[in-house]
Curated annotation (Swiss-Prot):
Binding site for Zn(2+): 198, 340, 355, 392
Active site: 198, 360, 392
The EC number(s) this enzyme carries: 2.3.1.-, 3.1.1.32, 3.1.1.4, 3.1.1.5
Name of the gene this protein is made from: PLA2G15
Glycosylation site list: 99, 273, 289, 398
GO BP: ceramide metabolic process; diacylglycerol biosynthetic process; fatty acid catabolic process; glycerophospholipid metabolic process; phosphatidylcholine catabolic process; phosphatidylcholine metabolic process; phosphatidylethanolamine catabolic process; phosphatidylglycerol metabolic process
Protein name: Lysosomal phospholipase A and acyltransferase
Effect of mutating residue 289 to A: Loss of glycosylation site. Mildly reduces production of the mature, active enzyme
């Protein structure tokens, strides 16, 4: 509650006390009432929140596949759907279909996919609703926030989205995100801290670059970036060429490749020329080398020409030279062998030999450090924090990460 002094009572206060009260009112931070912590919005990365699907399909790829369901079911993450044979059903349902005419994606016939839990944290705390440790994602961080006095679904909320798509196809999501931020500002008396991981940072940057500076100054207190692929990631070329099963032995890389290629967000995360040298060879074969200037031929040679169109659709979505326009805390992992380039004896349908560089195991250090360029391009602070030995996913539960986040939210 605010301090209300009735006019006829003011004269009864001693001069010293009146001066003290006025001084305290002037010095109070108008952005956040005393004793309150800033509300938090969590933005997950690629594969970083649950998806649900409902089926009414004209045909199926295998007699074991469900053709029709009465209600929505979890399509990501449900480990049972990734078993041999059943995974064919899963891929046919979760893939996107690219329309060359409209330059947009759509769901397969008879499949409807939705994102559960916008404004809640459950769909990004655990990717698997059974809450198995395999699917644990933001859980440790949210538990820490609760321990610091936050409440799930109130002053800490999740902003899940359809991570298969790039931002240009998720317009309603950004409208909902803006509305939620404004609502939290009103409910909790101050600007919001955005905490994003991996590709969620690119989504957040896309969002912030499209908001007026006055809006950002009012509603955003800080942006905490974890493992951001600002300049794209080298491993994307391997994902597109031969697939990547993320070391899950029951999933064949070529099997999962179809789904990975159909997600426009995959091509969006290819390395960018504002971070990488145009001379750098990312993929080497016995007959040809591919740099970032060779993407069109790369897509032709892997038999996925729609990928070149997807890249053209998404390459300019984020303006590299345009800073977010808010206080930025850029946390990045180092010291973990990270795929840097690939050599294929047989291209593209066999696993390559991998040359490693520095990074967090997924995001190359060169890409993560792109945020340094903004230090001279905005008035707001851009602070970098190295996380030595911190792997891309594990950094969310890293003690250093959590201690840093606590300082941002609650002070020293």
């Amino acid at each position: 509650m605010g301090l209300h002094l009735r006019p006829y009572r003011v004269g009864l206060l001693p001069d010293g006390l009146l001066f003290l009260l006025l001084l305290l009112m002037l010095l109070a931070d108008p952005a956040l009432p005393a004793g309150r912590h800033p509300p938090v919005v969590l933005v997950p990365g690629d594969l970083g929140n649950q998806l649900e699907a409902k089926l009414d399909k004209p045909t199926v790829v295998h007699y074991l596949c469900s053709k029709k369901t009465e209600s929505y079911f979890t399509i990501w993450l449900n480990l049972e759907l990734l078993l041999p044979v059943i995974i064919d059903c899963w891929i046919d349902n979760i893939r996107l279909v690219y329309n060359k005419t409209s330059r947009a994606t759509q769901f397969p016939d008879g499949v409807d996919v939705r994102v559960p839990g916008f404004g809640k944290t459950f769909s990004l705390e655990f990717l698997d609703p059974s809450k198995s440790s395999v699917g644990s994602y933001f859980h440790t961080m949210v538990e820490s926030l609760v321990g610091w006095g936050y409440t799930r679904g109130e002053d800490v909320r999740g902003a899940p989205y359809d991570w298969r798509r790039a931002p240009n196809e998720n317009g309603p999501y950004f409208l909902a995100l803006r509305e939620m931020i404004e609502e939290m500002y009103q409910l909790y008396g101050g600007p919001v801290v955005l905490v994003a991981h991996s590709m969620g940072n690119m989504y957040t940057l896309y969002f912030l670059q499209r908001q007026p500076q006055a809006w950002k100054d009012k509603y955003i207190r800080a942006f905490v970036s974890l493992g951001a692929p600002w300049g794209g990631v080298a491993k994307t070329l391997r994902v597109l060429a031969s697939g990547d099963n993320n070391r899950i032995p029951v999933i064949g890389p070529l099997k999962i490749r179809e789904q990975q290629r159909s997600a426009v967000s995959t091509s969006w995360l290819l390395p960018y020329n504002y971070t990488w040298s145009p001379e750098k060879v990312f993929v080497q074969t016995p007959t040809i080398n591919y740099t970032l200037r060779d993407y069109r031929k790369f897509f032709q040679d892997i038999g996925f020409e729609d990928g070149w169109l997807m890249r053209q659709d998404t390459e300019g979505l984020v303006e590299a030279t345009m800073p977010p326009g808010v206080q930025l805390h850029c946390l990045y992992g180092t010291g973990v062998p990270t795929p840097d380039s690939f050599y294929y004896e047989s291209f593209p349908d066999r696993d390559p030999k991998i040359c490693f560089g520095d990074g967090d195991g997924t995001v190359n250090l060169k890409s993560a450090l792109q945020c340094q360029a903004w230090q001279s391009r905005q008035e707001h602070q851009v602070l970098l924090q190295e996380l030595p030995g911190s792997e891309h996913i594990e950094m969310l539960a890293n003690a250093t990460t959590l201690a840093y986040l606590k300082r941002v939210l609650l002070g020293p």
